[in-house]
Amino acid sequence: MWNAGELASFELPLVNAEQSAQHATPDYYYRLAVRPIFKSYPIYAPGHEPAGYMDWLAQQEPALAFDASTLHSDAEWIAAGETVFDAPLGYGATFTPARVRDRDWYAHNQVPVTKDGRMPFARYVIRTKGVVDVGSGSCLMCHARVMPDGTFLKGAQGNFPSDRIVGDNLRRQAAVTNDAAALLDGVRLGQRTFFSMPWLKPDPIARVATMTIDEIASVYEAIPPGASTRVNLSLFAPAQIPDLIGVRDRRFLDHTGLVQQRSIADLMRYIAIVQGANAFDRFGEFLLVDPVPDPTKMDRYSDEQLYALGRYLYSLEPPSNPNPPNATTAADGRRVFSREGCNACHTAPLYTSNTLTPSDGFIVPGDHLKRYGIINRSVGTDPELALRTRKGTGYYKVPSLKGVWYRGPFQHAGAVRTLEEWFDPARLGRVPGHRFGLTLTPADRRALVAFIETL
């Protein structure tokens, strides 16, 4: 899976091509320890936890939950992939056992809870008998959603307020630290590690050097659930969290089309990178972690774990759509969709052409047009994510409109809360670009939204 030839070709070059990511060598990668996946248990919000639950957890023996040697049928591989999807990467960074049992924490951060009282974005894990850990960093944290009726939809664009909680955690640390200067230095260093592009002048993250903890926390807290920032993006250019339902049909991964998905192996490589292997990346002379750590002290998913996870993601199906496609308004909207030429980019049946469009300010290299499938026309949206992040290819991919009824917020940065707002010309002062549909009559606008919500 992790071989040099495929790694060299599955990503598009960055805008500054010489700064494109160089990933860990196969020799280094396969010396990383395989990440153990332990059996995990649900977390209940205050008022919903069964009596004696924590004492019961403390009596459980550690147990591994993934064993590739037992997997034979398609159903077994897919079920094992769901276990990987649920499994945390780390412990203590985002959650603590006390925090996830604190009513004030839920209220302050507006953490969604399922109808049966679970906080489903993390899990309790027993790695040592008698010690109950709260795991974080699983796929669940970003790619799962508590629906309005309290059901839980795995694979969907998430609605866990992860960045709001990062801001809250920063404020909590600042309130109790005995060394405010050291804390601030560490937080600023973390932002540079996650986001810096020192080959650009000025570095997009340079302003962090003069920001306070309060100011940094405020930026995180302003990022809405459904959007997030993570390694290689930018504190100042978050990205909409992608819906993974239907990912098997997408030619490009990431909003900037960074990764070509030619097979399940490309999806496996992509998951490996975003779930830890990006720590070993080099961008020109810039290393995220310098010096590169001893691989035997770090970990990775096994190829079998990645394959199972890929199979699970490919198996995901959308929930039943409550919006009737034959309703009069939706039928009118279908005609508006066709008349306005929306299907040129959002082409049925996937409602995406699976192509890329250049951002403002990016000149498409001649060899890209045929190699990658480019619509050589900018739609004028904010170019920051495409030009000034470590995922910046100069492009945005054409998103699929399937499943928008259960998703949101919209736009590549999650800057628009609803479809109604997207088609409201008043948004242009705050969210530029993609002017299509902004001159429709109110009736046509309502019809178009009604149709899109049936997809």
Regions found by a protein language model. Give the residues of each.
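Periplasmic c-type cytochrome electron-transfer domains
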Residues: 1-455
